[in-house]
Amino acid sequence: MSERDSGSSGPVKAKAAAPRAKTSGQAPFGAFVRKPVEKTEGKAKANAANAGSGATEMRMETAESWPVDAVEVGAIVDAYGLKGWVKVAAHADAGHGGDALLSAKRWWLLKGQERKSAPSLQAKTHSDSVVAHLGGVTDRDVALALRGSRVYISRSEFPALGADEFYWVDLLGLDVVNVAGVSLGKVADMIDNGAHSVLRIEYPATDKSGKPVTGERLIPFVGVFVKTVDQAAKQITVDWEADY
């Protein structure tokens, strides 16, 4: 994820795992806009108390029952312990935008063509990953069978952000224009360079022989360059010349 500093020269304050722009019939795979939050390691998220008795088990899903706003946020890489917990490699650091994994009430799992969903009974950070206990996963063997599953969360379950904070997935596809109104292309991807987020913009161009090609621009997502993000208008305005 990334947080754009609204100051004239402020950097993006938080970092994000590099995303891959990829679709699977759902919203684009996205890393998150990262927001510094209180570390949640050792703090369990208990959603079971709010769930009905019939909602605590894993269930099979279809393409039709899959949420239209599902966003891939990680992958199950291993079992954790002996009691059915799973270990997840999150696409954004746990505690820094991987928070959706901690707060979401239901996880949606895709492995090959098989779709499942399960309530998140408990989830917490553990070192550089997230560990969770999902409904219906009663022992280590069941947890091991979930290895390789890609984890999706409904976009509607992402934690709310403050002013001037954006989830990467919400920036993908937006038109980019400069302050003079010149179109610079569309956001194709977001990159984390370690210091701040970077917009990767694609636009139609031609090579030296006149053949159509896709051009690329990289614009740091910081306040000195990014002036406005209008999600309703699907447009980002930047202080950036077309010939840079």
UniProtKB/Swiss-Prot annotation:
Domain PRC barrel: 163-244
UniProt xrefs under InterPro entries: PRC_barrel-like_sf (IPR011033), PRC_RimM (IPR056792), RimM (IPR011961), RimM_N (IPR002676), RimM_N_sf (IPR036976), Transl_B-barrel_sf (IPR009000)
One GO term describing the cellular component: ribosome
GO molecular function terms listed in the Swiss-Prot or TrEMBL record: ribosome binding
Biased composition (Low complexity): 13-22, 45-57
Record keywords, A-Z: Chaperone, Cytoplasm, Ribosome biogenesis, rRNA processing
Sequence ranges of Basic and acidic residues compositional bias: 35-44
Keyword DNA-binding in record: no
GO term, biological process aspect, one: rRNA processing
Compartment(s): Cytoplasm
Location of the region described as Disordered in the Swiss-Prot/TrEMBL record: 1-58
Cystine bridges: none
Main localization (coarse): cytoplasm
Entry domain remark: The PRC barrel domain binds ribosomal protein uS19.
Function: An accessory protein needed during the final step in the assembly of 30S ribosomal subunit, possibly for assembly of the head region. Essential for efficient processing of 16S rRNA. May be needed both before and after RbfA during the maturation of 16S rRNA. It has affinity for free ribosomal 30S subunits but not for 70S ribosomes.
Family: Belongs to the RimM family.
Subunit structure as annotated in this protein's UniProt entry: Binds ribosomal protein uS19.
NCBIfam families given in the database record: 16S_RimM
Name assigned to this protein: Ribosome maturation factor RimM
Name of encoding gene: rimM
